[in-house]
Regions:
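Conserved small-residue-rich
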Residues: 47-86
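Low-complexity, Pro/Ser/Thr- and charge-rich linker/hinge segments at domain boundaries
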Residues: 27-54
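Helix N-cap and loop-to-helix transition residues
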Residues: 21, 57-58, 168-169
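Alpha-helical interaction segments
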Residues: 1, 15-16, 65, 80, ...
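Extracellular fibronectin type III
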Residues: 10-33
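Aromatic-lined, polymer-binding surfaces characteristic
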Residues: 75-79, 83, 87-249
Length: 249
């Protein structure tokens, strides 16, 4: 049938602010497939509490994949990309200022270590982190653009996720603060905007995913849980509201 939709703002206590928008309408044909996305409470009950967790959906098959990884046709490409990172000398530069390359290298090292468990990849990630942390990130650099923010955030997030049990408390805290800077900057901007925006290319191409991943890493952190869990719920509900129409892509 024909559905009508309008919106207005409300604060965190549910107190409405401002007037209703003009009504919108759309039609749902009878032949439209029915799909009900899981409630956030169900998603939350299944969220992991251990690290690494960014690719927790692979956990049931990861051991089998590791046994067979060397026979996979893409194994040489996997290790070749990681070797590029191993061969790069970051000791004379600020890695945070070259996020294009840094993103590729942290992704390649993450994937290679996750599948091979070869410590040369995790050791390289750790050395890279030490160099990254040696250069404090200014707001001017971190928020130069929304892609710049999430490029930097995901580099730190991958290392945090993969090396969590190896990092010192100070190293963990430094990465957590960086991720929280990004979450606190963008979450207020997204609320009330993205759910009423037809399509924001940057948001759906990368930014939403990275921000969601940062929230997933911190949702059960004793320092940030109360602040981060509502953020995670917001992005989950926003994604599931849009996902069926876009094929979950």
């Amino acid at each position: 049938g024909i559905w009508y939709w309008r919106f207005r703002q409300a604060d965190t206590h549910g107190t409405t602010q401002g007037e209703w928008s003009e009504p919108y309408h759309f039609e749902v044909p009878d032949e439209t497939p029915v799909f009900v996305t899981p409630a956030f409470s169900e998603f939350q009950s299944r969220m992991p509490h251990s690290y690494p967790r960014l690719h927790c959906y692979l956990d049931p098959k990861i051991e089998t994949a590791r046994l067979n990884v060397k026979s996979h046709r893409e194994y040489k490409m996997l290790t070749g990309r990681a070797q590029d990172a191993l061969n790069t000398n970051y000791t004379t530069m600020n890695p945070n200022e070259n996020t294009g390359t840094l993103c590729i290298h942290t992704q390649s090292l993450y994937d290679a270590w996750h599948l091979t468990q070869d410590d040369k990849y995790s050791d390289c990630m750790y050395r890279l982190l030490r160099q990254m942390l040696a250069y404090p990130i200014s707001d001017a650099l971190l928020f130069a653009s929304n892609f710049a923010s999430t490029d930097i955030a995901i580099c730190y997030a991958r290392i945090y996720d993969q090396l969590y049990n190896r990092l010192t408390p100070d190293e963990r805290a430094a990465i957590e603060k960086l991720m929280m800077r990004v979450l606190r900057w963008y979450y207020p901007q997204h609320c009330g905007t993205q759910e009423n925006h037809i399509f924001d290319n940057h948001f759906w191409q990368q930014n939403m995913r990275v921000i969601f991943q940062c929230a997933l890493l911190l949702y059960d952190n004793t320092v940030y849980a109360d602040e981060v869990l509502p953020m995670l719920e917001y992005y989950y509900e926003l994604w599931t509201a849009r996902a069926p129409a876009s094929g979950f892509n």
